[in-house]
């Protein structure tokens, strides 16, 4: 018995091994598709990287997981600004060593890997598709089987046929489903579409064979599994006209074109009865679009009534666009009806930027300028918002909108950049547990939502089911110090924590130490404090769930408050720099022509319409802690605190379809600040858009909110003895 106890003790003392890495299957990429922008290893095995479109690359392999991922960028210093691995819901953070990042992936997933807030049409992005093991090819003599290799020409199946596209099979052409029924496309093949559409105008709407990656006309009962669509032309990626009964599973669509337009992910022109599941889309326009028809831009074409679109389900998918909406219904002057649309259990990685007449959103319904039709019973449920622009833009006047539900919408870190709108004859619009971080929106102001044009007030549903919320103790901490997380109790619930540093825990009350001050996106070194995206998932025994998120700052170095002995007064002083710059210039090389002061980020340009502004003064920090600052502006803005550049918005991004001005741009940064006054310097460009920069802050005991005027002060003019600029 003693020997048995000693053996048991020895076994218990052994370290617990991590799950063994799984075997993977990865087909070779043909030389003409191979990319050198990144090299990738999975479980130590090199996997070919393929070039998709624009500056997008992708890698694809199959296995059960787990997977040890190693990615090396060829561009020197590529990861120095940080790393953004999405979906954020997965809580992934890599280890960075020079040009290489490494992380562990538990199982099959579809990822976007880029640098923080770099996801527009010229971004360098790597998409990673870790697929579940592929079922064997069906053994039927009538199957058209294509082995690995390069094929030049389109696929034109006939009714009743099944095509099997083996992993490693590449087709330069289209999949044409023209008046066919009961067709199956199986396997893991790739279609590369390089059409001859005019790259400077919209010809992609046409319903023609060989005009899209997948084109369908009056097709019925189609199943497409495991297909990758690469779209390099300015055309709709997948178009279905008056077609019904389509099922897509494990679809991967990547589109990019220099015009950054008219490259939707999937369009219905009439028809429906469709299911899209477990799929990935990167579009250069709307990801999904519902129209009754589209026959051209003449008055006759625009006013011709279209066919109904109905019964569409999209679920368990990962969605991204470089510019437009995730889902769009309608268009000005168009007439058609739609009903029974559901998007659920999906991740919105990149939810548009700017406007085309109407601001872009997760959901846009644009029934303006005499558009007619009834649109009913739309549900958006269990959606995770990463980088997004607005939630909903809805306008329909004749006869109207009814039955739109937004339930369990979780914005995990970033605030909305513009408000949502509801205009015209709209009713029964319901917001049920729309959350921004930990805060649940309970009113128009909290969403925010603007209601006009006779629309009925939106309904905000009272809390029900499990509630995800948590506290942090202590609220201020340095890297390596213990932090206690406590979730609000929910009946019969399980609690799962993702700390944003690549680790997880379970339980209502857990302890954790953040390993460094780099933050989830590995961008904290430049400011001395890292923001970790902490997520809490609460699920009860019936499967009802809720999520909460909060950005917590681990402090690496403190910034001391400044002792100000001279007399001060409220507000900031400012200087005006006239000029016709297209981007924010280096104001150290420019000369201000006049100055003044204001209560906050306002200025009087005295008639100038093209100018830059610099605001200077002090920011009063209420308590010691880690603070995050969110900067929003259309033409370009920059924030400096205590001489450290905290945030700088990206270059101006023009709105389209004659919408005036530039899109709202966004950046954020974090600092460890002691209570008291800290020097603040803000720059803003006024070139083609209206409005001044917006500055929001959050910190210990301080929810995300606009920096109030009371927090600003500046030296009284008679106390100024010297001048300078950060």
Predicted regions and their residues:
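Sec-dependent signal peptide recognition
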Residues: 1-9
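Hydrophobic h-region of N-terminal signal peptides that target proteins for export
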Residues: 9-18
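Extracellular/periplasmic carbohydrate-active domains that bind, remodel
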Residues: 21-465
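Short coil/turn motif common to extracellular beta-sandwich-like domains
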Residues: 63-68, 478-484, 624-626
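Short, conserved beta-strand segments of beta-strand-rich sandwich/propeller modules, principally
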Residues: 110-112, 484, 531-535, 626-628, ...
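Conserved structural position at the C-terminal beta-strand
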Residues: 115, 538, 682-684
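Extracellular/lumenal mature domains of secreted and surface-exposed proteins
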Residues: 464-558, 609, 696-701, 719-726
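Acidic/polar, compositionally biased interaction segments
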Residues: 545-546, 551-552, 556-726
